[in-house]
Amino acid sequence: MTTTKRLKFENLRIQFSNAIVGNFLRLPHSIINVLESTNYAIQEFGIAVHSHNSDIPIVHLGWDGHDSGSSENVVLINPVLATVYDLNQKSPLVDLYIQRYDHTHLATEVYVTPETSDDWEIIDANAMRFQNGEILHQTRIVTPGETLICYLEGIVTKFKIDRVEPSMKSARITDGSLVVVAPKVNKTRLVKAEYGHSNKTILKNGAIQLLKKVILRSTVCKMDFPKDNLFVVYISDGAQLPSQKGYASIVKCSLRQSKKSDSDNKSVGIPSKKIGVFIKCDSQIPENHIALSSHLWDAFFTHPMNGAKIKLEFLQMNQANIISGRNATVNIKYFGKDVPTKSGDQYSKLLGGSLLTNNLILPTEQIIIEIKKGESEQQLCNLNEISNESVQWKVTQMGKEEVKDIIERHLPKHYHVKETGEVSRTSKDEDDFITVNSIKKEMVNYLTSPIIATPAIILDGKQGIGKTRLLKELINEVEKDHHIFVKYADCETLHETSNLDKTQKLIMEWCSFCYWYGPSLIVLDNVEALFGKPQANDGDPSNNGQWDNASKLLNFFINQVTKIFNKDNKRIRVLFSGKQKTQINPLLFDKHFVSETWSLRAPDKHARAKLLEYFFSKNQIMKLNRDLQFSDLSLETEGFSPLDLEIFTEKIFYDLQLERDCDNVVTRELFSKSLSAFTPSALRGVKLTKETNIKWGDIGALANAKDVLLETLEWPTKYEPIFVNCPLRLRSGILLYGYPGCGKTLLASAVAQQCGLNFISVKGPEILNKFIGASEQNIRELFERAQSVKPCILFFDEFDSIAPKRGHDSTGVTDRVVNQLLTQMDGAEGLDGVYILAATSRPDLIDSALLRPGRLDKSVICNIPTESERLDILQAIVNSKDKDTGQKKFALEKNADLKLIAEKTAGFSGADLQGLCYNAYLKSVHRWLSAADQSEVVPGNDNIEYFSINEHGRREENRLRLKTLLQQDVVHETKTSTSAASELTAVVTINDLLEACQETKPSISTSELVKLRGIYDRFQKDRNGEMPNGENSIDIGSRLSLM
């Protein structure tokens, strides 16, 4: 059955059934069999009910899919619906015409009007249930001019169908259709406002006739409005102007649930007031748009915004005699707490060139404008074409009760009255924006594209990285340059998100706003607070319920946005912002709601210089010394986020205030002092090493390895202007391999100190985890940590234990680690500022894929030192200095010949030579201690000879006192000699070194040396780079791998 053909069934009787809820029929079994044979869905059938042998339909209904259960010629209908169309069980027979309504007969929008004001109040009281689709569930076929019924909480409401979009005689609605209800208010129940809100066009002096009415979309443009004309609007330059004067009013959003109060019973959908305006044209205004002056927005009690529906009514040109301000009296009623701040002459200058409207309230000026001509009020007063002398200006102070009434009944919530009586409007934060990231342009281009795959995108980045600041910059641009309405919400500040009904109501309000004011953009900052990722609840049922609510809310949000998006691709866009993409509910991605993801990283040095200059400029007291530049400071603040830079700038300011005689000039010393005491957020909790206490000169030999490390790690940072223009990808990975104890780990530790890079050391147990996915997560977090503190060296010691060849692990853990390493080291993002340094003694055990270009680009051997290299190592050991005192750690006699020791230590590694020196040092210590034990000690002496004059019997007492004094002198002398001995240093002689050389043996045996030499030779020459074929070995004793 095609859409143009109809099935006709005659001579059917009508019966009532309360089981039918809505605008449906139930058909007899004979008709159902015919419809089921067509293989079309029951939702696609529409039924036209005709009187028998009549061509005029009574009503168009849908089929609810049930059998009437009666005789073959009976159809069932809801009794209330039957009453509407005067159908009863005693009515004559009816005929049914059944037609298929396919996708070409779908209505996107249906405009209806309640039959009575009671119906409207029922809808208003049950707006949530109505908006959640009650009418869509109870209706399938809509026809202009017919009546619908809808059950809300058991109460029946009736609607008249005004029109459908796209226009057609009869159409089918689905879950994606929008039903727009025009309010119908009982006028006798309205409380008439004393001031303003007048929609009449009939005056006592005569009638103001309207030429034309248009509804335009408001836009916030960067325009210079005339200062002498407060109430002016600009429309598109291509529009024809029937008149240069007219009324402007805002059409309230009819999709939003009205909020009634005792002081304001106005209904949504009715213009709040009409204000007389001058109408001008400008080429900056897009077609079908209108720009309003700031005073006009203020008179509407509304923030300047995009998307508001502005009703513009043009006045006839020959009405000048009616709206003339000649001989008029303008009474300015001041409702501030204090006396009026301006005189009549000042108000004359402020309002003199405008078109004034009677009883107009200007909240920020705290005045009400009243216009009279003689004894009667005048609705409009044109002061632009007459002199101020022909107008009488009066300023009066309103009483306290009148002021209180105005504030309670007329001023919206975003206006507040201060204790001084001043009325102000809470406005948006208008910061001075500074663009430091290029991804804003990419995001704006994507969001403003006419066609995109899905409506949502995600911006992620760590806390303090600048997401909210970037969002504000983006919102400012799309509002000013692209005329898009933006609804911004910080999900962390939302209350009662655990209450499903209240949050659904809030989401419905967002979507209603965006549909009405569209094209629009919903920006949800910190989205993980509202749509977080479900986590393991460990048996806690309450936690499970909370996550279940979060998923329900997200599903509800996706469905609401998708409905609008499917109707009009340009109507709505969504931008999510969160700390990590993995913390957001995966339902967003499972339903393919998000199409693109942008990640915000720490600013580079140019952006940091720009930010530092911006934060310094905000603090007008500080200034840099002449020898400092912001580009120099940016090099010292690698890894700082914008928030870190802002806090750091404040710290510099406070440190500056503690200095005396500084003239508020930031010097190099002050900056370094503040920097050393500040830790950026990216480094908090990170095991980071920047001072390894191992200097380049502490390592002997290994000249080739040192050169390669400096070329790879130091040069790109030191000579950045040269390397930044390199057309090829720079080397970022080095493998140090060689015999045990030959300085691989020592080199890695010293290179960070030499090149001034951050250093993160990684050990196998910190990464490997038996649980699937845990090891990979550790690798990802490790690289993210290194990226946040770049330039950084990521050092993997004993790399063969972390990334062995795949297919030889019984648990499969290291296989997954290798796969993740391959992705991170040579992924699409690359490693900008992160260098990989790996050390191993068995390079043959490392997976060959990691040794290819783009990963570990260069392999450097740390070989067994030759005689000259051993001499170099010995000299480095004995010449090493203490970091704190600057003195040599190793005291060697002056005439010692280290070349002799180098000749006798063939086959020794660097670690062996260091151990030999330590053994020699111990021998010198033993020799020094033996010499110290033989030091002189002053003996005691009991035979003391002395003489005394006039002792008078006190001889023995004096002898004992003298003995005590002498013993104290002996103790002091012993202590002094011991203190002097402690300052001596054990000196290592050549004999100590020779004895230690005889006692020390190489740590690498001859057989092990031969084995390793063969491995390294094959690694250097015969390595073919072949990977395992993935097949398990079938040899006896081989292990299986969990792949």
Curated annotation (Swiss-Prot):
Induction: By oleate. SMART domains: AAA. Changing K467E: In PEX1pA1; no effect. Its main location: cytoplasm. It is found in: Cytoplasm, Cytosol; Peroxisome membrane. GO terms for cellular component: ATPase complex; cytosol; peroxisomal membrane; peroxisome; transporter complex. It is an enzyme of class 3 (hydrolase). GO terms for molecular function: ATP binding; ATP hydrolysis activity; protein transporter activity. Its EC number is 3.6.4.-. Changing H495A: Cells are able to grow on a medium with oleate as a sole carbon source. AAA-cassette D1 is required for interaction with PEX6. ATP-binding in AAA-cassette D2 is required for interaction with PEX6. ATP-binding and hydrolysis in AAA-cassette D2 is required for proper function in PEX5 dislocation. Present with 2100 molecules/cell in log phase SD medium. Belongs to the AAA ATPase family. This is Peroxisomal ATPase PEX1. It comes from Saccharomyces cerevisiae (strain ATCC 204508 / S288c) (Baker's yeast).
